[in-house]
Swiss-Prot record:
The gene is rpsG. It comes from Solibacter usitatus (strain Ellin6076). One of the primary rRNA binding proteins, it binds directly to 16S rRNA where it nucleates assembly of the head domain of the 30S subunit. Is located at the subunit interface close to the decoding center, probably blocks exit of the E-site tRNA. This is Small ribosomal subunit protein uS7. One of its GO terms (cellular component) is small ribosomal subunit. Coiled coil: none annotated. Keywords: Ribonucleoprotein, Ribosomal protein, RNA-binding, rRNA-binding, tRNA-binding. Part of the 30S ribosomal subunit. Contacts proteins S9 and S11. InterPro entries: Ribosomal_uS7, Ribosomal_uS7_bac/org-type, Ribosomal_uS7_CS, Ribosomal_uS7_dom, Ribosomal_uS7_dom_sf.
Amino acid sequence: MPRRRRAVIREVAPDAIYNSTLVEKFVNSMMWQGKKNTAQGIFYDAMDKIRERTSDDPLKAFKKAVENAKPLLEVKTRRVGGANYQVPIEVPQNRRTSLAMRWIITNARTRPEKGMAEKLANELNDAANLRGGAIKKRDDVHRMAEANKAFAHYRW
């Protein structure tokens, strides 16, 4: 058990262009080595590419992509009587969002396209249309929770 107090969750200021805290959190989680301007440039380029392709509001597509990638259940390992069980638990709301954003970013980085903005635009577009790596990861997590439903009574 930690001996310190629980860390205070700080509010994130909304971004300048879309006035959205979700966008700012996404940019912060995409950032490497404190290079926020680079991360913002990549994100806004990706949003411009989405706007060109779909001629729709890119913020709406972004929110839909994050919403589609959110997991409802996940498994946590619990040790009971010398055996380890994968116990399905419900995911808290803030963890759902952070997992969805992390999966989108990770899968965008592994895509074969040229340039991160292009990769991110394609991954967001795929996630908004219920396909792509982030959605596959969410489905895998849900499948794992479904397979271990028998151990749900070990929940704590």
